[in-house]
Amino acid sequence: MTYIAYRTKEKIVIDGKLNENAWLQAPKSPRFVDIVNGGPVLYDTRAAVLWDDVYLYIGFWVEEPFVRADITERDGLIFTENDVEVFIDGGDTYYELEVNALNTIYEVFFIWKDAYKRGGKYDVPEFDVHERDAYTFAGNHD
């Protein structure tokens, strides 16, 4: 699926309400599908993406009658609850942002291991997997 992000000149207030004219006119994505089998899901979920000179805006319409969220700690494992997730592909990296119904944020930046080479653009101390605070995806030291 391809979705086009549309430029907006209207001011958008970040308040969780998608009632500005820009959102009302923005084309919504097709209905989301099951991540495992690609089939239809029980409840409708769609998104729209807008941008201006400063921000990228992503709005979700989620038809979920039984929303559950308990985690309030930033970067807690909110993907175990109801949340929305955004992945931005950077080629050999990706940025992930998740937000649950309590506005708890899970944010991470991944660099594929094959992209990390000595002398390459990611050969910086912050990304050294042998540093004390560097963790692999599973949370264990490499």
Where are the model-predicted features located?
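Structural preference for beta-rich elements and adjacent junctions enriched in aromatics
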Residues: 1-142
